[in-house]
C-alpha cells in the first residue's frame, strides 16, 4: 500500500480536522403526540410509526 512521502505537520493536521463538524440531528414532530423525534423511526414517547401503533406500552 502507498505511504506518504512526508509527515503532515501538526498545523496542517489541525487545519484538515477543522472541517470535521458535528451536525445536530434532524428532528421532526410526531403527528400523534407532537413530541420531537428522529425521522423514519418509532416515536419513543407514544410508540407510533406511520400512523400505526408499533410498540406497546407496558
Curated annotation (Swiss-Prot):
PANTHER family per the UniProt record, alphabetical: 50S RIBOSOMAL PROTEIN L32, LARGE RIBOSOMAL SUBUNIT PROTEIN BL32
A matching Pfam family: Ribosomal_L32p
Protein's recorded name: Large ribosomal subunit protein bL32
GO cellular component labels: large ribosomal subunit
UniProtKB keywords: Ribonucleoprotein, Ribosomal protein
Taxonomic lineage from the root: Bacteria, Bacillati, Bacillota, Bacillota incertae sedis, Caldicellulosiruptorales
GO molecular function: structural constituent of ribosome
GO biological process: translation
Domain of life: Bacteria
NCBIfam families: rpmF_bact
Organism encoding this protein: Caldicellulosiruptor saccharolyticus (strain ATCC 43494 / DSM 8903 / Tp8T 6331)
Amino acid at each position: 500500500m502507498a505511504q506518504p512521502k512526508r509527515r503532515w505537520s501538526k498545523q496542517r493536521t489541525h487545519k484538515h480536522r477543522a472541517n470535521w463538524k458535528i451536525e445536530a440531528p434532524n428532528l421532526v414532530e410526531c403527528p400523534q403526540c407532537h413530541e420531537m423525534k428522529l425521522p423514519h423511526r418509532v416515536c419513543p414517547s407514544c410508540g407510533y410509526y406511520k400512523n400505526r401503533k408499533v410498540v406497546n406500552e407496558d
